[in-house]
């Protein structure tokens, strides 16, 4: 008998130890018997499920797990699609009773100091909010009665003081509790009144922005606070220029080192933010972050990281603020007669050439034939390449386009007209790069080039400072990011990329702005 009792005692102790190592949250939600309740955590604006339980006929159930839940703000999600928040800290064995009629009023907590102080503070705020609303209505009714207005304002002020005192007491009494740290994280930094200059106030605010919000405190990622806090800093407090943003992003990412969860979130968040951003400067940030940190992304596959590295290597060649790669092209003649003289040679190309396939054993020989035929063709455009870098101009607009593109058909005539009327008057030259089809299919290339000829002739796209360019061997597809047509790049006189992937009208506005800034600088 003693042995049996001993075994039962040991079993009970081991069960208790197992429970202490994991979580056991007993719930009773009135009015939803035999229904499902979800336990989950906040992750910025998302609700992430962690566990489910089906309540019994008494509306009771237990969430159990062998591993402890990470500290943070959690929720209980009900079949009505309503939910109420709870906190998970180090002590994860407790009970919660509630009623669907009023979550805050009917909440009962047993065994969790964290949730009790959370609930008490919520009640205080709720009561203060109701009082404040009543006083606001009374203040409106008391307009014109100065004594009454002042009396009401004092009462409103006392409410704020009461809430502030509750916060200070909470922080002093439970300094190491998650809820105290969460409350502190919700509070904005206060700029000392002694700092009166607005610029100084801004820089103080920025320098101390994260004082109440430690970026390396992992539980904050399981709240609604983390991402909005970072977004506000990046969007509102940082200079929106590539070099500044790169520096700020590095600071944010490095602040999270030492915690894999935070490091992964911060890197992924900033990487995706600038990968999707349509601002032409955003790509500089995306490329820099990917180049530095991609190899550290232990959670990504090698194939994914390899693909990212290839994209980064390509985009490095065409970043705004960086020198562009040169374009070595052949120029289409500037009159219809000489263009028509080229048509027999593209007909000959079609007759001589045949489609080639890499799988065929004679691929290399046929590829050599392709090169010979294309060399013969482009030599009839002229025997020397035109270097875009070597053409002197204050501004150089490079547009990649093709005659089958419906948007190109609309934009290219407009661009040519705008060039003749406006762009050429401010020292801008245009390099219209024809994007040919695959050189492995001469039939398709023949058809496509004829369309190019037809379009240029019909629109009479001939003018001094306007260059119609072509070169099937040029590596522009590797050196310029052209995922759609037409795509515009704007270079300065030193061939540095100053804008890309915006309309030619926007580029014109930028050129005007730069010219005006230059004139102002001269006048100083």
Show the residue positions of the predicted features.
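Bacterial Sec-dependent N-terminal signal peptides
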Residues: 1-28, 434, 500, 517-524
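A non-transmembrane, solvent-exposed segment enriched in polar/low-complexity residues
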Residues: 21-175, 182-212
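Coil residues (strongly favoring Ser/Thr
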Residues: 36, 51-52, 100, 244, ...
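Thiol/disulfide oxidoreductase modules built on the thioredoxin-like
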Residues: 186, 471-515
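A recognition module on extended beta-rich or small alphabeta surfaces enriched in W/G with H and D/E
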Residues: 198-244
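N-terminal targeting signals for export/organelle localization
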Residues: 243-371, 523-524
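Short active-site neighborhood of thiol/selenol oxidoreductases, capturing the structured segment around
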Residues: 344-352, 357-365, 371-416, 429-433
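Structural microenvironment flanking redox-active thiols in thiol-disulfide oxidoreductases
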Residues: 409-458, 473-477
